[in-house]
Each structure stands twice: as structure tokens, then as C-alpha cells.
């Protein structure tokens, strides 16, 4: 009988910035030890995708690894064994999707869980640190981990022309399948400041909520709590667009 090939991670990165890709992500990957991986680069300029979901699904379908790591080009692994440690969590825990930062509803309040750092000053990205994987409601998109056996049956939903909320979408899919949504302890560095909010986000949240309105009364994200009631949602998005236009937040 043919011996099974070694387990492997597939890293999928959608990038339009070769400098950041080479100096941040690839540079830190070159130092990783005790782990087998392939790196799949999807050039968003070359293919002209209209959404993150399309680009990530395109890359994910090329993956041969047991676990798919959808990763931003400005992620830097700070420890030489960090990728191997994340792989060990994948093997020890059963999950539908995992990340390194997430949001959870605790008694009506949004709490963020993560050990990662972000921004040039390397500030903590969340208000709660963890020492073991924790279950959350949704995850941040800087790193999304999906078992290949899950991705073969479930891809990112194309909710509209947007590069937002694909991690939230996948987490909501997994919860409907009763598959855990986890955050793994990791002290990696997301070199950008994580401030990806723009006006398109508020269109995307309306598309996303419309898709899941029969399943969830509210949806939790890093930028707020969003009601499934269409009137309340439109009012909130109008207010948030106005606030963003005036204050940038």
C-alpha cells in the first residue's frame, strides 16, 4: 500500500503589493521550521477579481495541503516555530474555521480575543489575551484557517463586489453546520494597523445580513453589532456612513 504523503499547510495569499509580500510574509516564512508548506500567490491585479471571496476561492481550489491558511501579505511570523505551532493546534482541535483574532458576544457585549500585534508600533490587537484556543462568533480576516475537507464542500460566499467580511461569512456558515469557530493563540505581527474600514464596508454588511437574516437576529463583527431587521439595519448603516464620512471611524 502506498505510504501517505506528509501533512502540509497550503498558504493562500491574495496580493497586489509585491514589496510587502516579499519583505514581510515571504521573509518570515523563510525562517519557519518543523513544518511543510506550499505558498499560493493570487495576483489580484492580474485576474481582476471583484471580491475577496472570488480571489480566495480561486486560490483555495489550487491548494493541496491538509489545512488552508488564507493569509494577508503583511503578516510576519515572529517565532521560527509559529507556523508549526498553528499546525499543531489544527491537528489537536476539531473546527470548521479558525483564526488568530476573533469576536464573541458575552452577555450582550462584544469582546475581542487575540494575542497578535498590529501596526508599526506593534500594539495589542484585542482586549482579551488567550492561552488556549477559544470559541468565538466571528474571526478577523488577517489569517483564516480552514481544513481542506471543509473547504472542499464550503467556499467563501460572493455577497457582492467587496473585499470585506469574508471571514465573518465563513464563520456564519460554519456555525450553521455546528462546526466550531476558533481563535488560536499566536503572537504573530500584522504589520498594517488593521484599519480597513471604508464606505463599502457598510454596503457589504447589508449584503451579508440579508444573506443570513433568517438564521441570525444580529451579526457581530469587529466594527459593531448589526441587526437583521432591514429597517434598523439601513438606519444604522446610514448613521455609520455619515459618521465615517465626518470622523473617519
Question: Where are the regions that the model predicts?
Answer:
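Short aromatic/hydrophobic "clamp" motif used to bind/position activated sugar donors
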Residues: 68
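Active-site-adjacent helix/loop segment of glycosyltransferases
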Residues: 177-249
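Donor nucleotide-sugar recognition loop
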Residues: 152-173, 180-190, 196
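A recurrent flexible, glycine/aromatic-enriched loop bordering the glycosyltransferase active site
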Residues: 125-146
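The conserved acidic donor/metal-binding loop of glycosyltransferases
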Residues: 72-76
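Glycine-rich, basic loop-to-helix element that forms the pyrophosphate-binding segment
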Residues: 46-63
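Short, acidic, metal-binding catalytic loop of nucleotide-sugar glycosyltransferases
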Residues: 3-6, 24-37, 41
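Conserved donor NDP-sugar-binding/catalytic core segment of glycosyltransferases
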Residues: 80-113
Amino acid at each position: 500500500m502506498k505510504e501517505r504523503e506528509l501533512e502540509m499547510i497550503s498558504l493562500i495569499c491574495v496580493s497586489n503589493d509585491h514589496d510587502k509580500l516579499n519583505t514581510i510574509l515571504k521573509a518570515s516564512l523563510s525562517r519557519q521550521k518543523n513544518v511543510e508548506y506550499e505558498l499560493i500567490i493570487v495576483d489580484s491585479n492580474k485576474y481582476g477579481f471583484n471580491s475577496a471571496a472570488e480571489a480566495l476561492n480561486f486560490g483555495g481550489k489550487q491548494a493541496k495541503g491538509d489545512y488552508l491558511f488564507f493569509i494577508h501579505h503583511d503578516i510576519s511570523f515572529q517565532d521560527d516555530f509559529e507556523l508549526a505551532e498553528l499546525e499543531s493546534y489544527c491537528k489537536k482541535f476539531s473546527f470548521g474555521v479558525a483564526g488568530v483574532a476573533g469576536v464573541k458576544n458575552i452577555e450582550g457585549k462584544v469582546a475581542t480575543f487575540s494575542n497578535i500585534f498590529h501596526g508599526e508600533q506593534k500594539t495589542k490587537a484585542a482586549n482579551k489575551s488567550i492561552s488556549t484556543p477559544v470559541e468565538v462568533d466571528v474571526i478577523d480576516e488577517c489569517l483564516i484557517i480552514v481544513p481542506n475537507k471543509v473547504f472542499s464542500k464550503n467556499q467563501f460566499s460572493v455577497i457582492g463586489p467587496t473585499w470585506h467580511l469574508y471571514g465573518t461569512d465563513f464563520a456564519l456558515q460554519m456555525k450553521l453546520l455546528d462546526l466550531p469557530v476558533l481563535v488560536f493563540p499566536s503572537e504573530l505581527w500584522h504589520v498594517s494597523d488593521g484599519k480597513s474600514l471604508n464606505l463599502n464596508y457598510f454596503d457589504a454588511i447589508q449584503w451579508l445580513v440579508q444573506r443570513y437574516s433568517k438564521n441570525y437576529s444580529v451579526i457581530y463583527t469587529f466594527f459593531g453589532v448589526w441587526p437583521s431587521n432591514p429597517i434598523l439595519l439601513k438606519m444604522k448603516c446610514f448613521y455609520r456612513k455619515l459618521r465615517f464620512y465626518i470622523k473617519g471611524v
